[in-house]
Amino acid sequence: QRPVRASGELHHVRTRLYLRVEHEDLWGYGEVSPQPFALNGDPGLDQVIDALRNALARLEQVTNREGELPHWSRVARLGAATARDNVAYALVEMALLDRELRRERVAISDLWIPRAVTPSLATVSLLDDDVPWSIHEGVARVRVKCAPGALTTTARERLRALAQPVLLDFNCSAQRDDEVLDVLAAVSKVAVVEAVEQPYGVGNVVDHARLALALGVDLSLDEGVRSVRDLAQIARYHAAAMVCVKTARVGGLANARTVIARAHELGLRVYLGGFFESPYARRVNRALANSCVSEPSDVSDVAVSALEEPTTIATSFGVEPSPRVLEDAATLTVL
């Protein structure tokens, strides 16, 4: 993956946390990719690791008390629903789901029946002319990282060459409506803009609602979507027409399905985020999306080296993390 610059950080290769949960000679793997430091309401890597240690201790307590691992769908309720707990328990949940599917010798498609093939979403940036854009064949929408300010000549040329509609992602970088409207107007001269994503800070539904009336295109919220309560506020204020759901941010796969279903009930268009995940987690995202998301999402294959390619298995998610990746990883906690 090429690095993609956003307004607050350089989106490059993040540290990926893998968790292997083994019990009674059966195991499963989870994966999350926290950002290096806390930003826009999301926890940093160190915070997630601290929360994970507590989550594993909690998992051990529950297992000792009940005599078996909790069902994967219960895991999210074991945490405190904080930003850091959401990511940590999402990691545990994925590992337990993988283990249960392996135990039952079934595939994820048996649990989440595919309804359609979810189109893919690519991510590029207007904030760094030195990094080439990489857009794979078949991409249906392009998320373009941006910030207030004028477009460079290179940025305009790249936008003009796009065949796909654009989603302008501000990553909470705007302060005023005119900053967003100026960028939208400039980009609209050379590309088709479908939506503007998260121009203002997390929780600021009032300013988003006002801006939505002036945009002329859909407004989407990403960092501001963490629970069904957030959806209720978004719908109440008419703050967005679209939402991006990220499984780790909302506390795992079970919560993600609940959030997606509620968003649809509220008439919101939903897409699944997950720019940083490895091919392993992308496979899980794809299974989730194919069962309940029709908007272009982060579900395409990720270009990695042969040593990083996941290993094919017959059940569960159809793959597991590459042995080489796990061998080279630093062990943080062993339960």
What are these regions (language model features)?
Residues 1-40, 307-310:
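Structured beta-strand/loop patches that form or line metal/cofactor-binding pockets in enzymes
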Residues 6-8, 12, 72, 76, ...:
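N-terminal amphipathic alpha-helix/helix-capping segment at the start of soluble metabolic enzymes
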Residues 19, 25, 92, 105, ...:
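Conserved, mostly hydrophobic/aromatic
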Residues 21-22, 27-104:
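Metal- or metallocofactor-binding catalytic centers and their adjacent structured scaffolds
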Residues 28, 166-168, 219-220:
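Residue-level marker for buried hydrophobic side chains located in beta-strands
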Residues 106-215:
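Metal-dependent enolase-superfamily TIM-barrel catalytic cores that perform enediolate-based chemistry
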Residues 202-300:
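Catalytic alpha/beta core domains of metabolic enzymes, predominantly
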Residues 273-335:
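Flexible C-terminal active-site loop/helix
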